[in-house]
Swiss-Prot record:
Catalytic activity as recorded in UniProt: a 1,2-diacyl-sn-glycero-3-phospho-(1D-myo-inositol-3,4,5-trisphosphate) + H2O = a 1,2-diacyl-sn-glycero-3-phospho-(1D-myo-inositol-4,5-bisphosphate) + phosphate
Uppermost EC category: hydrolase
EC number(s) given by UniProt: 3.1.3.67
SMART domains per the UniProt record, alphabetical: PTEN_C2
Residues annotated as the enzyme's active site: 382 (phosphocysteine intermediate)
Record's bilayer topology term: Multi-pass membrane protein
A molecular function (GO) term: phosphatidylinositol-3,4,5-trisphosphate 3-phosphatase activity
Protein name per UniProt: Phosphatidylinositol 3,4,5-trisphosphate 3-phosphatase TPTE2
């Protein structure tokens, strides 16, 4: 497993490795203003960074190189360094929960609503009971008992010749199963409240199906019914009463529905869900008019993700004719007719970033939609509803001036998307590059008046990677680098003669000198590959994004992670 360890920059031995990347670039224009805070160097991880671990970008000037002319407007050769400093160099880099008064007011308002939403779970005992009846194991056990009960009933009906007599062993097992489901109903009534639980007609029918066979089992076990054999007209009536137990097949269907809910909660982890008015969706009101949610699915995926029919029902009921949906997934889609053709799609790869141009277009489009009617809202989703979704939502929070800084918007989104009553795991914007691009957008809004910054052309000269033990010693076949721009690979170290790789044992670093690298501009993605490192997202150990317009003084220091291999 490869994990990103935050707020720690000290070098480790054995399996704990500090990464430090150093890129040397050629510049063809002057540098813009400093880059806003945001986490940086990218690795693909399964865990989201804690908002308090967000760090800044430090810019330093490197020694100048000799001047060279090139085909791009006579750009002069300068050196840009991307690196990760040690702990002594990172003081004050961490983000310390930038909670402003306005943010506290917003969070407090939602906390009151959420408290009302879970008012029936406010006691410690209810929380414990809720965790039990909502657990996956409890649901699976219930399905198993229903199957067992139906199997025993069918076996009894097929192999028992008696019209009336029912074996005591079967009745005892049936009674035990019925008591379990009665206990299940009572616990759910205790947790959810009687009025709320029985407001669902299916719950009422399910309770009746449980209670009726339970009463029959009690009569058969504890009362003498032999006298009924002398009354022929009772035989068929009792036989029909036994067949009522077959209705428990419906209970199995009901249990399947509960199991689906459990699976969806298991997949969504501790993301804040909407559980009012008969809905249970991985969906969060970030503000009154901005919704973050996971992918609306159909078919088999709807078993563990938001069913698209339920999402449509929710939006049509809560915001009829006043919602617009944004699909940020490049890897999956659905028919826009589900949402009355009010769907916009932005193609962003999983765990990657939108382009700066896409962020500007998106925020302006949403702003126009919001301005058309005070009732208009947007529902934004990717696959899980936090990384790509959070990046775009945070950009709009800045564009609409709900928050002024990247740190505030990122922290706020994380607080809203995370349900801390279930777990403290952070469910905000995932990757360092996504955090960084929110910082870029803050500059676009405040320094460039919501317009793209001037294009800056750069050339890669060198990569330096520090302290990756066992990597780089095998030459070109061991460590590779790839550069992607405009969704095209513009450089790959696998091509012969376009770079040299040297492992400096004394300084414990790998030097990758690039010969005749391509001109880079706007949004650039850098991927690293090695046979000695595990592959994760994008089929590589780690990668990062940056925008050339925000590189200052040609030294771009990326904080801050250690890769820990276990």
């Amino acid at each position: 497993m490869c994990r990103v360890m935050k707020a720690s920059f000290s070098r480790k031995v054995k399996l704990e490795l500090c990464l430090l990347s150093d890129c040397a670039l050629l510049s063809s224009s002057s540098a813009p203003t400093n880059e806003l805070s945001g986490t940086n160097l990218e690795a693909h991880i399964n865990e989201s960074p804690d908002p308090n671990a967000l760090v800044g970008v430090i810019i330093e000037r490197s020694p100048s190189d000799s001047t060279q002319t090139n085909e791009f407007k006579g750009a002069t050769k300068e050196t840009l360094t991307i690196e990760t400093p040690h702990s002594s160099e990172c003081k004050g880099a961490g983000l310390l929960s930038p909670v402003s008064k306005s943010m506290l007011e917003r969070l407090s308002k939602f906390e009151v609503e959420d408290a009302e939403n879970v008012a029936s779970y406010d006691t410690k005992i209810k929380k414990i009971v809720r965790s039990i009846v909502s657990s996956f194991a409890f649901g699976i056990f219930g399905v198993f008992l229903v199957l067992l009960d139906v199997t025993l009933l069918l076996a009894d009906l097929i192999f028992n010749d008696s019209k009336l007599y029912i074996p005591l062993v079967y009745r005892s097992i049936s009674l035990a199963i019925a008591l379990f489901f009665l206990m299940d109903v009572l616990l759910r009534v205790f947790v959810e409240g009687r009025q709320h639980y029985f407001s669902d007609l299916l719950n009422v029918l399910d309770t009746a199906i449980i209670v009726t066979p339970l009463l029959v089992d009690v009569v058969y076990i504890f009362f003498d019914i032999k006298f009924l054999r002398n009354i022929p007209r009772w035989i068929h009536l009792v036989r029909l009463l036994r067949l009522i137990i077959l209705i428990r097949i419906f209970h199995l269907i009901h249990q399947k529905r509960e199991l689906e809910k459990l699976m969806r909660r298991l997949v969504s982890e501790n993301k804040r869900r909407y559980t009012r008015d008969g809905f249970d969706l991985d969906l969060t009101y970030v503000t009154e008019r901005i919704i973050a949610m996971s992918f609306p699915s159909s078919g088999r995926q709807s078993f563990y993700r938001n069913p698209i029919e339920e999402v449509v029902r929710f939006l049509d009921k809560k915001h009829p004719n006043h919602y617009r949906v944004y699909n940020l997934c490049s890897e999956r889609a659905y028919d826009p007719k589900y949402f009355h053709n009010r769907v916009s799609r932005i193609m962003i790869d999983d765990h990657n970033v939108p382009t700066l141009h896409e962020m500007v277009v998106f925020t302006k489009e949403v702003n126009e939609w919001m301005a058309q009617d005070p009732a208009n809202i947007v529902a934004i989703h990717c696959k899980g509803g936090k990384g790509r979704t959070g990046t775009m939502i945070c950009a709009f929070l800045i564009a609409s001036e709900i928050f002024l800084t990247a740190e505030e918007s990122l922290y706020y989104f994380g607080e809203r998307r995370t349900d801390k009553t279930n777990s403290s795991k952070f469910q905000g914007v995932e990757t360092p590059s996504q955090n960084r691009y929110v910082g870029y957008f803050a500059q676009v809004k405040h320094l460039y008046n919501w317009n793209l910054p001037p294009r800056r052309i750069l050339f890669i000269k060198r990569f330096i990677i520090y302290s990756i033990r066992g990597v780089g010693t095998g030459g070109v076949c061991d460590l590779k680098v790839r550069i992607v721009m405009e969704k095209k690979v513009v450089f790959s170290s696998t091509s012969l003669g376009n770079c040299s790789i040297l492992h400096d044992i004394e300084t414990d670093r790998v030097l990758i000198d690039v010969f005749s690298g391509p001109p880079l501009y706007d949004d650039v993605k850098v991927q690293f590959f090695s046979s000695n490192l595990p592959k994760y997202y994008d089929n590589c150990p780690f990668f990062f994004w940056f925008n050339t317009s925000f590189i200052q003084s040609n030294r771009h220091i990326l904080h801050s992670f250690r890769l820990v291999f276990t």
